[in-house]
Amino acid sequence: MTAYWLAQGVGVIAFLIGITTFFNRDERRFKKQLSVYSAVIGVHFFLLGTYPAGASAILNAIRTLITLRTRSLWVMAIFIVLTGGIGLAKFHHPVELLPVIGTIVSTWALFCCKGLTMRCVMWFSTCCWVIHNFWAGSIGGTMIEGSFLLMNGLNIIRFWRMQKRGIDPFKVEKTPSAVDERG
């Protein structure tokens, strides 16, 4: 097996991990699954030799986990500076800056936005990644980000319609425990 096909295999694994990410209405589960996906796709990009994308994806994974604990603007600024610095230091072609831009805007969204607004900004970020992945020849990366674009776009429309009907799509229903079901 060549390094190229190993990289593509890791990309397909990332595809399988990430395919259901945007169906999560629970933001904690959404962020955890997004973090795992980001780490695996980061390995994929390093194996392909697209280092700005690999570094951006690994920073995405770490950043997404950290947003579960804090929404500090200082922490956000650190991730934005790291992403921009690493991306600018390693890029060789202008298209390699798209994942850096996508990571910066999604960092802002994860720290400063919630619900539908966060998902809309994430959709824009996904557009940046789709263009990059196609350019880089990433089969799994293009498949997953293209799927993210479609699924997140459809879910944005679905959640927006729910809000128009007065339903909070991000309110997670709690199942009653066995103790509560006596009766």
From Swiss-Prot:
One of its GO terms (cellular component) is plasma membrane. It comes from the Bacteria. It is found in: Cell inner membrane. Pfam families: Imp-YgjV. It is a multi-pass membrane protein. The chain crosses the membrane at residues 3-23, 39-59, 72-92, 93-113, 134-154. Residues 1-2, 60-71, 114-133 are periplasmic. This is Inner membrane protein YgjV. The gene is ygjV.
